[in-house]
Amino acid sequence: MSRILGLDIGLKRIGVAVSDPFGVTATPLEFILNDEKVFEKINDLIKNYKISKIVIGLPLTLKGEEGEQARYTKEFVENLKNHIPQDIEIIFVDERFTSSLAEKTLLQTKKKNKKEKIDSLSAVFILQTYLDRLSFSNEATNYSY
């Protein structure tokens, strides 16, 4: 079974999460440095986890508009498409508030390196949002009359 990869694109680091094989839960992975080897590392994840889709957080403004970071994310995705298999579907998910949710969650723990963990935890929230929507839409289809 294939899995879904969740990414939170940042200028320095990329938060990473992966779904379970059934597409129910998202689990954080170690962040990736956004450097010259970033596409190679993402390709390794695609191969190792048998990824069929990538869900990427799109950082919209509070008004729902695309700002500078959203434009950077879209540009990153255009470059990513040139480095991954063409059959991998890429989906954007509104990521407003995921970083603040991740920060609040980590404040309740005593983990070290919180800054690095926020990136992958944000990726978990991004991916889990997508998985929950997918599950809800499947349930609605299965229970329609």
From Swiss-Prot:
Gene Ontology molecular function: any one: nuclease activity
EC code(s) of this entry: 3.1.-.-
Keywords: Cytoplasm, Hydrolase, Nuclease, Ribosome biogenesis
Class of this enzyme: hydrolase
GO BP annotation list: rRNA 5'-end processing
Pfam families: RuvX (PF03652)
Gene Ontology CC terms, in alphabetical order: cytosol
UniProt subcellular location: Cytoplasm
InterPro entries: RNaseH-like_sf, YqgF, YqgF/RNaseH-like_dom, YqgF/RNaseH-like_dom_sf
Record family assignment: Belongs to the YqgF nuclease family.
Protein name, UniProt field: Putative pre-16S rRNA nuclease
Origin organism lineage: Bacteria, Pseudomonadati, Aquificota, Aquificia, Aquificales
